[in-house]
């Protein structure tokens, strides 16, 4: 494991008691580590864990960032499980009524949000530290990005308006691949041959990026969406709380993204036709008023 003691968690988060029993949080740490391994690769995670235990690291920034990400997510889950005491006689809440008070729901939500923000910031630092690491560049997920027309997190941010997040970009690689395949089929040819035309390339990037976000929103539950996308799907609940967007709001937003994608697909085709000297297709919206041809077809 990349974290092996309660004292490490304390140093990484600043909020965990170093004298807590490490075994109580060990299984949570392992599950979070496994989730991150699914993205960066299990071999890469094993190497980072070995470097952490050995004290000598080829990429110390990556080790530290990975430890912080695991620590913040694990402690958030640990705190959620321990808000209520689980005993033989049932679930109880133990509070010193003179000196303690139960937090409000909005306070718990704010604390969860703070942990999530630190978790995703640590993941972003991890991905930046791994971008130039040849060991990470050998992972299957990283190799898939070589065929993409949206090359990195900065490009994704510029095209869609989401916060620049290397972790979000890596999470979206499978959706970007599927979206690019759809765009290539609709366009009629591979997108690798359009890099010389700036306008056409931009239209293709817009279509791929918007389609990828729509795919991720449809295929993922709100709880599993990366924080960068969750901030898009949230609506202000007023007061000290923020409520998640309703299903109707989410569906409306996904429909809007799909319409935007089709707009940029049509723009790609128009630019291709202009370059080839082909006139744009025109569609008759209303029939011509012909005095000699007055009839209605049912």
Place the predicted regions along the sequence by residue.
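Conserved short "hinge" loops at termini or chain/domain junctions
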Residues: 1-68, 77-209, 215-298
